[in-house]
């Protein structure tokens, strides 16, 4: 092994770190020594990796107006959207943890050992009934995509949408007009279902699953009689392979990261914000700030790239705080798209209403399964769900 070069600044500094550690181990002031070591390490990384250097701003101002002007420039050609439950709540779809209205606060009647059990694959295989009872309660029918969903549709229509990464399993992105190629459904989807038997894996469409749910029949495979499960990611299951394959290529070429309606607390989805190059602006539209982290600790722990909205070194991150639909309307207005967006929402909602009216069940038979819409309009719903790391 080559000997360390004492003239190299990093190796010299590293030697000092070792000396400090050796000295500290022999001292009684461990707490004070640990504090000094942390300060020394901060200085080390700042000097060798330019952690503390001021970066040139990527936007002419760190505001929504600055983002809009950037989007209108030649520099912004590929937008990635990262979305969570907050973009679907205005459609009447609850998130999981909001007090009194979140799904976890309304599961007592299912007599679960703990709320999360309803989404655990091991519990589901033994006791599928609570999940399908909940699925019937939550099944949309009347739910429509929101302004946020249609804003992403506009990005697609204008050739700006590179990909939408969604934590939601409600299929509203598809109903709004995004196609399979546009989407990475990180936590799966109700759009398709599969037999849980590894030797079978027969696939079933949403219309088939919808009929079973509304007839209160536990879905069983027509080939082998095993359970059939919607393709949502339960606790204990891996994320779809597409999540990782798209991530590897998409974030090499993204020009703007648009984050909407997510707390950025669920891994590995939350780590996607750190995949964007340092030269890529990031806009958060959410009710509260999210995704912030200590840049030093983030680098040490491999969680670098946290949002920085407020420090003197902020250079690319913008937070618009409030209702997600209102945030999209505000951005659309700055882009000159507001009327186009509002017209799109009205037109699409009218189409959904017309179809729902044509398919409305007879009141005397309302308990019967409803006729399934064609695939382009298929709907299902739960919402963003916390996944274990």
From Swiss-Prot:
| Chemical reaction(s) catalysed | N(6)-acetyl-L-lysyl-[protein] + NAD(+) + H2O = 2''-O-acetyl-ADP-D-ribose + nicotinamide + L-lysyl-[protein]; N(6)-tetradecanoyl-L-lysyl-[protein] + NAD(+) + H2O = 2''-O-tetradecanoyl-ADP-D-ribose + nicotinamide + L-lysyl-[protein]; N(6)-hexadecanoyl-L-lysyl-[protein] + NAD(+) + H2O = 2''-O-hexadecanoyl-ADP-D-ribose + nicotinamide + L-lysyl-[protein]
The intrachain disulfides are none
Question: Does Zinc-finger appear among the keywords?
Answer: no
N-terminal signal peptide: none
Q: Report the active site residues.
A: 187
**UniProt modification remark:** Phosphorylated at phosphoserine and phosphothreonine. Phosphorylated at Ser-368 by a mitotic kinase CDK1/cyclin B at the G2/M transition; phosphorylation regulates the delay in cell-cycle progression. Phosphorylated at Ser-368 by a mitotic kinase G1/S-specific cyclin E/Cdk2 complex; phosphorylation inactivates SIRT2-mediated alpha-tubulin deacetylation and thereby negatively regulates cell adhesion, cell migration and neurite outgrowth during neuronal differentiation. Acetylated by EP300; acetylation leads both to the decreased of SIRT2-mediated alpha-tubulin deacetylase activity and SIRT2-mediated down-regulation of TP53 transcriptional activity.
Q: What is its main location?
A: nucleus
Looking up InterPro entries in the UniProt record yields:
DHS-like_NAD/FAD-binding_dom, NAD-dep_sirtuin_deacylases, Sirtuin, Sirtuin_cat_small_dom_sf, Sirtuin_class_I, Ssirtuin_cat_dom
Matching entries from SUPFAM superfamilies are given as: DHS-like NAD/FAD-binding domain
What is the activity regulation entry?
A: Inhibited by Sirtinol, A3 and M15 small molecules. Inhibited by nicotinamide.
Q: How is the cofactor bound?
A: Binds 1 zinc ion per subunit.
Chain positions recorded as Zn(2+) binding sites: 195, 200, 221, 224
Q: Which residues form a coiled coil?
A: none
Q: Where in the cell is it found?
A: Nucleus; Cytoplasm, Perinuclear region; Cytoplasm; Cytoplasm, Cytoskeleton
Q: Which residues carry this modification: N-acetylalanine?
A: 2
Superkingdom of origin: Eukaryota
Q: Which positions in this protein are listed as binding NAD(+)?
A: 85-89, 95-97, 167-170, 262-263, 286-288, 324
Molecular function (GO) terms for this protein are:
chromatin binding; histone deacetylase activity; histone H4K16 deacetylase activity, NAD-dependent; metal ion binding; NAD+ binding; NAD-dependent protein demyristoylase activity; NAD-dependent protein depalmitoylase activity; NAD-dependent protein lysine deacetylase activity
Q: Which residues carry this modification: Phosphoserine?
A: 23, 25, 27, 53, 100, 207, 368, 372
Region listing for Disordered, in residue ranges: 1-34, 350-389
Query: Which residue ranges does the record assign to the Deacetylase sirtuin-type domain?
Result: 57-338
User: Which family is this sequence assigned to?
Assistant: Belongs to the sirtuin family. Class I subfamily.
Question: What is known about what this protein does?
Answer: NAD-dependent protein deacetylase, which deacetylates internal lysines on histone and alpha-tubulin as well as many other proteins such as key transcription factors. Participates in the modulation of multiple and diverse biological processes such as cell cycle control, genomic integrity, microtubule dynamics, cell differentiation, metabolic networks, and autophagy. Plays a major role in the control of cell cycle progression and genomic stability.
Name of the protein this chain belongs to: NAD-dependent protein deacetylase sirtuin-2
Q: Which organism is it from?
A: Macaca fascicularis (Crab-eating macaque)
């Amino acid at each position: 092994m080559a000997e360390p070069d004492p003239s190299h600044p990093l190796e010299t500094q590293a030697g000092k770190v070792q000396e400090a550690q050796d000295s500290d181990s022999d001292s009684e002031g461990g707490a004070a020594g640990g504090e000094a070591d942390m300060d020394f390490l901060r200085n080390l990384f700042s000097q060798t990796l330019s952690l503390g250097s001021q970066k040139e701003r990527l936007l002419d101002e760190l505001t929504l107006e600055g983002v809009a002007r950037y989007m209108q420039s030649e520099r912004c050609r590929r937008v990635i959207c990262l979305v969570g439950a907050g973009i679907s709540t205005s459609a009447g779809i609850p998130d999981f943890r909001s007090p009194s209205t979140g799904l976890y606060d309304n599961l007592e009647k299912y007599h679960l050992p703990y709320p999360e059990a309803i989404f655990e694959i091991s519990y589901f295989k033994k006791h599928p009934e609570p999940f399908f009872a909940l699925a019937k309660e939550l099944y949309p029918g009347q739910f429509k995509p929101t302004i946020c969903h249609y804003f992403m549709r506009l990005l697609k229509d204008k050739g700006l949408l590179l990909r939408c990464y969604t934590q939601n399993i409600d299929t509203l992105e598809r109903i709004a007009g995004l196609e399979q190629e546009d989407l990475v459904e990180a936590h799966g989807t109700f759009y398709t279902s599969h037999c849980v038997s590894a030797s079978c894996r027969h696939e079933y469409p949403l219309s088939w699953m919808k009929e079973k749910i509304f007839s209160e029949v536990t879905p069983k495979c027509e080939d082998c009689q095993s359970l059939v499960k919607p393709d949502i990611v339960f606790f204990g299951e891996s994320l779809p392979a597409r999540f990782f394959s798209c991530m590897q290529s998409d974030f090499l070429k993204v020009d703007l990261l648009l984050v909407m309606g997510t707390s950025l607390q669920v891994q590995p989805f939350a780590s996607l914000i750190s995949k964007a190059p340092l030269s890529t602006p990031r806009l958060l539209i959410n009710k509260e700030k999210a995704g912030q982290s200590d840049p030093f600790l983030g680098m040490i722990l491999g969680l670098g790239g946290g949002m920085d909205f407020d420090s003197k070194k902020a250079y690319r991150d913008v937070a618009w705080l409030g209702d997600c639909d209102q945030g999209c309307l505000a951005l659309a207005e700055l882009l000159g798209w507001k009327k186009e967006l509002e017209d799109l929402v009205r037109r699409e909602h009218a189409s959904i209403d017309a179809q729902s009216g044509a398919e409305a069940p007879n009141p005397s038979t309302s308990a019967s399964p409803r006729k399934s819409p064609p695939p382009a309009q298929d709907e299902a719903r739960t919402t963003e769900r916390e996944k274990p790391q």
